[in-house]
Amino acid sequence: FRYYFDLNKRNKIATRLTTGVGYAYGNSQFMPYIKQFSVGGSNSLRAFPARSVGPGTYNFLAINDTTFFIDQRGDIKLEGNIEYRFDIYKAVKGGLFVDAGNIWLIKNDTLRPGGKFAFNSFYKQVAVGTGFGLRFDFSFFVLRFDLAFPLRKAYPVDGSEDGTNNEFRWAFRDIDFTSKYWRRDNLVFNR
């Protein structure tokens, strides 16, 4: 579902909501790979690397020491975004955006703990990110660049100095553009 609000000739608000549920039937245990859902990346949650979010509270990076091939898939998808688009100069356009969403599993998976969908907790597992983008609109194609960072991760993060208080929380107090470590761990550039 997409909806656009034209504020005036040069400014608009674009919204999008994407949902999906898939279920393997017959003698299949899992949906075909191509039919499974993923979130994260340039056409999804832009503050997270491609296909890196979820399912649920599962955190691939906490268990694996590689970011070479993160490919998280799920049976349920909920994703939305809102973007304020504006003209900067002729073919150059800008956008400020907020993206939110996650994927979940229908069945428990021992290899991906925390991935099963539950009505009483799914809203706590929604990842949220924000950022700024530039668009170069040449009529016959659009070249797009986005820089984004997470405001809320889908998994609990440590909020204490001693490393023992894992909680779902907003990350406003952690934002520090002057820290090279924060930039390395949080800024995501999409093209």
Label the model's feature ranges:
Residues L134-L143, G163-R191:
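Outer-membrane beta-barrel "beta-signal"
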Residues D65-I70, G115-N120, P156-D158:
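Extracellular loop and loop/strand-boundary signature of outer-membrane beta-barrel proteins
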Residues T110-F138, L151:
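Strand-loop-strand
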Residues G40-S42, G74-L78, K124-T130, D137-S139, ...:
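Residues that define the transmembrane beta-barrel architecture of outer-membrane proteins
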Residues F1-F86, L96-P113, Y181-W182, L187-R191:
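C-terminal outer-membrane beta-barrel translocator/porin domains of Gram-negative envelope proteins
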Residues K9-T15, I76, K90-G94, S139-L143, ...:
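Outer-envelope beta-barrel architecture signal
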Residues F5-K9, F86-K90, D137-F140, D176-T178:
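Outer-membrane beta-barrel strand-turn architecture
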